[in-house]
Amino acid sequence: MLEDKRPPVCDYEGSDYQSRFWETGGREYEDRCEGIALKRLLPAGGELLLELGAGAGRNTLRYPGFRRIVLLDYSRTQLKQAQERLGRSECYLYVAADIYRQPFVDGLFDAATMIRTLHHMVDAPAALHQVRKALQPGATFILEYANKRNLKSMLRYALGRQKWSPYTLEPVEFMPLNFDFHPRAIREWLRMEGFIVEKVLTVSHFRIDLLKRIIPPGFLAGLDSILQWSGALGQFTPSIFIKARLAGDGAGSVPADPTAFFKCPQCGQYPLIDQGNQLRCSACHRIWNISDGIYDFRGEVA
């Protein structure tokens, strides 16, 4: 069965990740740097943006030019936090789903972001393939990934304090379901899916605990913003941002009814039948729940 073949998923259900990692975890510097990078790479606006691995909506307000945003995350807990932060409106659609088995019709979105999410993907090429299917030709894709070939890992490897090589192309799993990737491998996977890389930014140049303790985060982020453009020459920071465009042209129309956004993630059938608080597949008869404003495609309703 399809469920048995899917790669494992990093599930933040019930986690205090947003408060522990971001709000009280000493990462204001990283958050500011990522905000600067997103502002530089985002298109001026659009109709429908897919935020993959949206979590608690930390970055969602950084996409003001888009008329509607779909927040996708595997964790319903994280989406509830995003809903509390952003509210319920026609601007935001909350979807609990597996990136490897997305519930969207092909060619729906004119933009997508994947920030601090690919590093949880056991099968990154499969995840990028799903992104490509969801996008319209000519759509913008902003991808952040954890860089295997960063200065710290290169130094540790040279000193014999690290077994894995930062120079080989295969991903390294430094802890369960946490992966670093080689820049050349990422570029090749994007090319194979028909993406054209337009800009590369290096981010978090000063991710050093001592510096973050003694230098104000705003000042550090300002320095980082000056250096981000060096990504066009080489990528040696722990975090890399890419702006890519899917080959082709065309701006497809976006359905007014969000029910038309979805296909059955099990068999691919669309449209789904709206049953109020559930969506039903007319082909395989699976039922997907809608509860508290969150569409849940993680598993069939019992």
Protein language model regions, located:
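A C-terminal cap/extension of S-adenosyl-L-methionine-dependent methyltransferases
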Residues: G160-K163, E188, K199-Y270, Q275
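Acceptor-substrate binding/catalytic loop of class I
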Residues: W164-A185
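A short glycine-rich, Lys/Arg-flanked "PGG" loop and its adjoining helix->strand segment in the class I
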Residues: P125-T140
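Class I SAM-dependent methyltransferase SAM/SAH-binding core
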Residues: A54-R101
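A conserved beta-strand element that flanks and buttresses the S-adenosyl-L-methionine
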Residues: T113
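Conserved class I S-adenosyl-L-methionine
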Residues: M1-G55, Q78, I142-S165, R298-A302
